[in-house]
Every structure is written in structure tokens, then in C-alpha cells.
């Protein structure tokens, strides 16, 4: 029903990396993604290296993949890259049950998330 979602086309100065099915809630993952948005790639990697959050390693791997894509696939200058977009999407939710007292059950939700990081080359501003 409705229109099929189309993926956004990247500009010549952009590169992207996507990680799917990350076993954490989108809220927790977005806290880490939010912290690197708009920063230089070098600064973002440094922040993720020393972050105490569990998802920082996953976000760091995705950012490194985006940087490698920019360098190898798009021939962009790594020193000029900034994190233009870092957004999180909701994936599936595993539903589990836990036996409780008097024959009842408690619902356990195990959410998964998708992460997309887009880096772009910083433009020269005069």
C-alpha cells in the first residue's frame, strides 16, 4: 500500500556505511550516534574510542567503514571528512516470555536497530 520508499542518492562528495540488526534499542544507539553528528571524522573516532557506552564500538566500526568507503570507492580526502549524518532506525523486535507467578507470563522485548552514517568532504569556504 502506498509508495515504495526509495533510497536517497549520495552526492559525489559523500560516502555511506550501514550496519543492520544491532542488538540494542534505537534510543540507546541514538545517544551515541548523536554525539558524533556534525564532527570531523578524526574527532568522532577519538570520542568513540574513549566513550563508556557499550554501543560506541559498533558505531566506531561503522564510522571506520564509512571512512574506508570514502577513501577507496569515492576517492575523497580522509583528512577533510566530517560526519554529515548519523541516524538510527528501528529493526525487528524479538518477543520472549518469562513465566511469572500464578500461571501468568511477563513479556520480554529484545529490540534491534539499524545504523547509517554518512560522511562528506568538507567544502572550502572563502
From Swiss-Prot:
Among PROSITE patterns, the record links this protein to:
RIBOSOMAL_L22 (PS00464)
Keyword line: Ribonucleoprotein, Ribosomal protein, RNA-binding, rRNA-binding
The biological processes this protein is annotated with in GO are:
translation
One GO cellular component term of this record is: cytosolic large ribosomal subunit
Q: Which InterPro entries match?
A: Ribosomal_uL22, Ribosomal_uL22_bac/chlpt-type, Ribosomal_uL22_bac/org-type, Ribosomal_uL22_CS, Ribosomal_uL22_sf
> What is the protein's quaternary organization?
Part of the 50S ribosomal subunit.
Q: What does this protein do?
A: This protein binds specifically to 23S rRNA; its binding is stimulated by other ribosomal proteins, e.g. L4, L17, and L20. It is important during the early stages of 50S assembly. It makes multiple contacts with different domains of the 23S rRNA in the assembled 50S subunit and ribosome. The globular domain of the protein is located near the polypeptide exit tunnel on the outside of the subunit, while an extended beta-hairpin is found that lines the wall of the exit tunnel in the center of the 70S ribosome.
Similarity section: Belongs to the universal ribosomal protein uL22 family.
Provide the protein name. Answer: Large ribosomal subunit protein uL22
What is the species listed in this Swiss-Prot or TrEMBL entry? Rhodospirillum rubrum (strain ATCC 11170 / ATH 1.1.1 / DSM 467 / LMG 4362 / NCIMB 8255 / S1)
Amino acid at each position: 500500500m502506498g509508495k515504495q520508499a526509495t533510497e536517497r542518492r549520495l552526492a559525489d562528495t559523500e560516502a555511506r556505511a550501514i550496519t543492520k540488526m544491532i542488538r540494542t534499542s534505537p534510543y540507546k544507539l541514538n545517544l551515541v550516534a548523536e554525539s558524533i553528528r556534525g564532527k570531523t571524522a578524526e574527532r568522532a573516532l577519538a570520542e568513540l574510542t574513549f566513550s563508556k557506552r557499550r554501543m560506541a564500538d559498533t558505531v566506531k566500526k561503522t564510522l571506520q567503514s564509512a571512512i574506508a568507503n570514502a577513501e577507496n570507492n569515492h576517492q575523497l580526502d580522509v583528512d577533510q571528512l566530517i560526519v554529515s549524518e548519523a541516524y538510527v532506525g528501528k529493526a525487528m523486535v524479538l518477543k520472549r516470555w518469562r513465566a511469572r507467578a500464578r500461571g501468568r507470563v511477563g513479556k520480554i522485548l529484545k529490540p534491534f536497530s539499524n545504523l547509517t552514517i554518512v560522511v562528506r568532504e568538507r567544502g572550502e569556504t572563502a
